[in-house]
A protein has these predicted regions:
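Short, acidic, metal-binding catalytic loop of nucleotide-sugar glycosyltransferases
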Residues: 34-45
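A short, glycine-/small-residue-rich helix N-cap motif at loop->alpha-helix starts
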Residues: 78-88
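Active-site nucleotide-sugar/metal-binding loop of Leloir-type enzymes
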Residues: 88-102
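Conserved catalytic core of nucleotide-sugar-dependent glycosyltransferases
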Residues: 119-216, 220-222
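Short beta-strand-to-loop acidic/aromatic patch adjacent to the donor-nucleotide binding site
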Residues: 99-111
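N-proximal low-complexity "stem/linker" segments adjacent to membrane-targeting elements
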Residues: 1-35
Length: 314
């Protein structure tokens, strides 16, 4: 009898389930879905769930139109407003039904760029057989993991502006929010960063969950998400993921050659909107560029188990 050989499926055979959460940022949701449609072959996705949390009438109409345009999309409407219990309960139901699938979770204020899906699947493939790296995310400049991966680039490119990208945690650092968006919009920071051959991955022990790909390796550790307060404190899917990462000593792979853009954390949103208009962000996103992803093969685990160069110093 001839030797049996396991054939790894091509990465094109992987059809992730997309879980898109939206609640109150109507203009961000509009840009998010426009970028998805502009930069993604949505037929590559097994299914798209738009989890709509207590939307206003105009927002609801936009969500319904987006779903109607795509045969593989479903609108899941839940209330009242808030992660607990509505959104986490909806995620529990969806993820439990797709335990054997590859999942991409996306927030309404995250804007994808060309080849984002190919890069994300490629990163997933590189780590699919590593139990210690169950999550992969793009480089998101306005996020703690993204800021960590950008650290060396920022120090070399902007040595005289360290006060702009240092300081408080990113989630409440309005100076960094504004500074980063101005560099992206006016000095081609993303293009310059990608122009140099960056390390393919950076690794961190935590994540922000606005854009991430994962499978049952982490789902079996975090599901079901709590739908009540824990010890009197509010909870979230992000807290559940980070607790599992910490307790199991696991890492998140951050793509070094694929950037996606997060508009803002909630504490900085009002300030940022007064200085960086969402219309300007949309104009920028229409011209977004990225490196193409390489073609490769991947096995999905089964069962439990030169543009304008930055001036030195800005």
């Amino acid at each position: 009898m001839g030797k049996l050989t396991y054939l790894r499926p091509h990465r094109g055979d992987i059809k992730p389930v997309l879980l898109l959460l939206t609640s109150h940022r109507l203009d961000c949701f509009l840009i998010c879905t426009r970028c998805l449609e502009r930069y993604t072959d949505l037929d590559r996705l097994k299914h798209i769930y738009v989890v709509a949390n207590a939307l206003g009438s105009e927002h609801q109409a936009l969500a319904k139109r987006f779903v109607a345009r795509h045969h593989n999309a479903t609108l899941v409407e839940r209330g009242p407003r808030g992660l607990v219990p509505a959104v986490l309960a909806a995620q529990n139901e969806i993820l439990a039904a797709h335990m054997d699938d590859v999942i991409i979770k996306l927030d309404e204020d995250l804007f994808v760029t060309p080849h984002w899906l190919e890069h994300l699947i490629d990163g997933y493939c590189d780590h699919a057989e590593r139990p210690d790296v169950p999550l992969v995310m793009p480089l998101v400049p306005i996020s703690p993991p993204g800021r960590h991966v950008l650290n060396r680039f920022l120090r070399i490119s902007y040595p005289s502006e360290r006060a702009m990208y240092g300081g408080p945690p990113i989630e409440e650092n309005w100076v960094y929010h504004r500074w980063m968006w101005e560099k992206l919009l006016h000095e081609n920071l993303a293009e310059v960063y990608l122009h140099d051959l960056q390390p393919k991955y950076g690794y961190v022990g935590y994540l922000t969950i606005n854009c991430v790909i994962f499978d049952q390796r982490i789902m079996r550790l975090v599901l079901p998400f709590p739908t009540n307060r824990v010890a009197g404190q509010t909870t979230s899917d992000e807290k559940a993921f980070n607790l599992a990462l910490s307790s199991c000593k696991m890492k998140v792979a951050v793509l070094g050659r694929s950037i996606a853009h997060h508009y803002s954390f909630s504490k900085c949103e009002d300030y940022l909107r007064s200085h960086v208009s969402i219309d300007e962000v949309w104009r920028y996103m229409q011209g977004a560029s990225a490196h193409p992803a390489a073609t490769r093969q991947c096995r999905v685990p089964s069962g439990p188990s030169e543009l304008t160069l930055l001036r030195a110093g800005g």
